[in-house]
Amino acid sequence: MKVSAFIQSHITEGAQDMLKSEYLQHVYTQVVTRDPDQREFHQAVLEVLESLDLIVDQHPEYEKHGIIETFVEPERMISFRVPWVDDNGQVHVNRGYRIQFSSAIGPYKGGLRFHPTVNLSILKFL
């Protein structure tokens, strides 16, 4: 998905204001460019990157091995339909999700989400 030059410059300026590390600014820009409509997820990523800002420059191996890029992209995003019948016999179909970020240290954490108001951005935020 192509992002306009205006949006791209706005993303970069916002990240520069919040993040000292050029590497983390680059990672954040990639996240926003890849999923420009997922504002809740952008907020969560920015908060995590801010907490890493002080240590990432002390550990150049993080950038060398793409550690932060791995953290901000889920391993799997599963979407499925959930048909159900209400008390009046009316059939409804909701969309269900499961987002799985990392299995590096064992089984995935989290559960399935079915609520009609959730979307990928909110689930990745969680």
Task: List where the protein language model places each region.
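Short, Lys/Arg-enriched N-terminal segments with co-localized hydrophobic residues
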Residues: 1-17
